[in-house]
Amino acid sequence: MAHTRAHVFVSGRVQGVYYRATTRERAQDQGVNGWVRNLDDGRVEAVFEGPDADVEAMVEFCHEGSERANVTDVEVEYEDPEGVDGFEVRW
């Protein structure tokens, strides 16, 4: 099974709307490793590592986000996995 890493930047109303917490819960349910954090410019940055299909499911989730989010753009860069273990919210 092939593994990949997606480095994602999400724009819109994505801070203060439980986007990071919801992303962490979904990633843990999906069995994907990585992290998520708020950026000073109002975007959310996330990294997902795992099997291709599971990482793609997380990228698709980023287009929706939490119930209160309003996503306007998702930028994705695919990279070689770095062996991240677990999933965390970074500050």
From Swiss-Prot:
Keywords: Hydrolase
Enzyme class: hydrolase
SUPFAM superfamilies: Acylphosphatase/BLUF domain-like
Database matches in InterPro entries: Acylphosphatase, Acylphosphatase-like_dom, Acylphosphatase-like_dom_sf, Acylphosphatase_CS
Domain of life: Archaea
GO MF annotations in UniProt: acylphosphatase activity
Record-annotated Acylphosphatase-like domain positions: 5-91
E.C. number(s) listed in UniProt: 3.6.1.7
Residue positions of the active site: 20, 38
Catalytic reactions of this protein: an acyl phosphate + H2O = a carboxylate + phosphate + H(+)
Sequence similarity: Belongs to the acylphosphatase family.
Protein's recorded name: Acylphosphatase
